[in-house]
A protein has these predicted regions:
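Nucleic-acid endonuclease domains
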Residues: 1-74, 80-511
């Protein structure tokens, strides 16, 4: 595969071009007048990438499944992606600049790589696949999405180019990417073998992205394969998960991470390998009480969350929380210890994701394109299960094993979409209200901090499986830092209803 002469560069030329662009806004480097298109269209997907490719590098855009450029004879894919300081870290970056500021930057979204190949012959060799050819060597340019609201395409002109990096994957990461790709390839091969007729084959492929999703570690398939109103079929692209891109971004800006990173001594290249590891741990530790586990794993008796610490030690590592393990973070695996009764009940509500209200302000946003949709698609849960036989005697609590689940299409389309749409309607119709809590006499109740108790009328756990709840140690006027429709409130989070989790876990066998 060769590129045209206008796409051939030396590393020195690339350095000169990108160093000259760093610190400038996308609008300032737009020599090819990409932003002129925004006069006619408010939404232009990929306009930041168009500016980098056509203005900074100076080559024309194409849609070929080939690498963008050649650097000193080495084929390289150019990717432009947005980074941003999460709202939770805004207090930490106040007054900071340069490297001290940049270490707080995280990925705004995943990185789209290339179209999934559907036309036969289906590619079967990973090393020569379009996906790996475009992923093996990446030149990633970072711009800062300096907004917490959705901006029109023209607004990107104000976003600064922060930095860039050359990215190649470790052997461990390549193994994970290869396993993900082979899962997709094998599925397509089987469908093409079983269904020779194109229409029947397409009907069989509808929804296959959701079917494969629980088994993919680092890759996401978006959008879903489905029939459109015109009768054609919407086909997906390979995309690196936002969780994985976030790992890349933070590793680039925080050079000290490698020293402090918490990794498993024995990682896994597939969910099948992780499941096998969990099964082996279950065989070894199932039925052991917390005191027995503490002694077997060498854990100090003063440790507070003993069950979580036991699981951390089972995996051969040592940290404060399971979700500090980078192997889990890359793949969007949320590790959460669950304590049940012998009947399987009493599971607490689970706190999930902080809500950025930028998408709620965009009336034209589609659910399938939303950050909320991506979150529920990309994340799965690994649940170490403990059974509490006596609520008054923790020493009788025993380890039962592991269960793992992802959100299926039905749950996302029904429960998550319902919460997303209903909360957006409250905002767009100006129906969002503050609801005070009253005592039996009809007086407003006050909390221990002296503030009146209450919350906005967002979806509640009484009626929704996915609901809103504020997050702060105390609720005061000072901690109500979020403002929606002029109503001040605590930062809002998505929560998952405990009864749903309990029912889901009862339906799933132990690994």
């Amino acid at each position: 595969m060769a590129v045209s002469e206008d796409r051939k560069f030396t590393k020195e030329q690339v350095y000169t071009l990108l160093e000259g662009a760093k610190g400038k806004t996308l609008g300032e480097v737009d020599k090819s007048h990409q932003f002129a298109r925004t006069l006619e269209s408010k939404k232009i997907t990929g306009i930041a990438g168009d500016v980098i490719e056509q203005s900074v590098f100076g080559y024309k855009k194409d849609s070929k499944q080939e690498c963008d450029i050649e650097i000193d004879g080495v084929l390289t894919e150019v990717k432009t992606t947005g980074v941003r300081v999460p709202k939770r870290d805004l207090k930490n970056v106040s007054g900071k600049k340069g490297e001290a500021y940049n270490i707080y930057l995280g990925a705004k979204e995943g990185i789209s790589i290339t179209h999934v190949t559907f036309e036969p012959p289906i590619q079967t060799d990973f090393d020569t696949s379009h996906f790996w050819e475009k992923t093996e060597r990446l030149l990633i340019i970072f711009y800062e999405y300096k907004s917490y609201e959705v901006v029109p395409a023209s607004g990107y002109a104000k976003f600064p180019i922060v930095d860039y990096c050359y990215n190649s994957f470790s052997q461990e990461e390549k193994d994970k990417l290869q396993n993900d790709w082979e899962i997709v390839s094998s599925h397509l091969q089987q469908v093409y073998h079983d269904y020779q007729d194109a229409e029947k084959r397409n009907e069989q492929l509808v929804g296959f992205t959701h079917l494969l999703r629980p088994n993919l570690l680092l890759i996401e398939l978006v959008p879903g394969f489905k029939r459109t109103a015109t009768g054609s079929y919407q086909k997906p692209r390979y995309r690196l998960k936002q969780t994985f891109v976030d790992y890349i971004v933070r590793g680039h800006f925080d050079k000290s991470r490698a020293k402090n990173e918490i990794v498993l001594k024995e990682s896994f290249s597939s969910f099948a390998q992780l499941d096998a590891r969990c099964h082996a741990l279950t065989l070894k530790y199932k039925g052991k009480t917390l005191p027995e586990l503490r002694e077997m794993l060498g854990i100090d008796a003063k440790v507070k969350d003993i069950s979580a610490k036991c699981v951390i030690r089972m995996f051969g590592t040592d940290c404060n929380r399971l979700n500090q393990i980078s192997d889990f973070n890359k793949a969007g695996i949320i590790a959460k210890t669950i304590t049940i009764t012998p009947q399987g009940g009493r599971t607490e509500d689970m706190k999930l994701k902080h809500i950025d209200f930028e998408e709620w302000a965009d009336r034209d946003a589609d659910f399938e394109d939303s950050d909320v949709y991506d979150y529920f698609c990309e994340h799965s849960f690994l649940c170490p299960i403990f059974c509490e036989h006596d609520s008054k005697d923790p020493s009788k609590t025993v380890f039962e094993g592991f269960k793992r689940f992802a959100f299926d299409e039905e749950f996302i389309e029904n429960e998550v979409r319902r919460t997303w749409e209903d909360s957006r309607n409250l905002i767009h119709r100006n129906e969002l209200e503050w609801e005070y809590v009253y005592d039996k006499k009809g007086n407003k109740r006050m909390n221990n901090s002296g503030s009146y108790m209450g919350a906005p009328n967002f979806p509640k756990s009484s009626e929704y499986k996915v609901f809103f709840r504020g997050g702060a140690d105390v609720s005061t006027e000072k901690t109500r830092t979020e403002s929606v429709n002029g109503i001040r409130m605590l930062p809002q989070f998505f929560w998952l209803k405990g009864s749903y989790i309990a029912k889901k876990l009862q339906e799933i066998p132990y690994i």
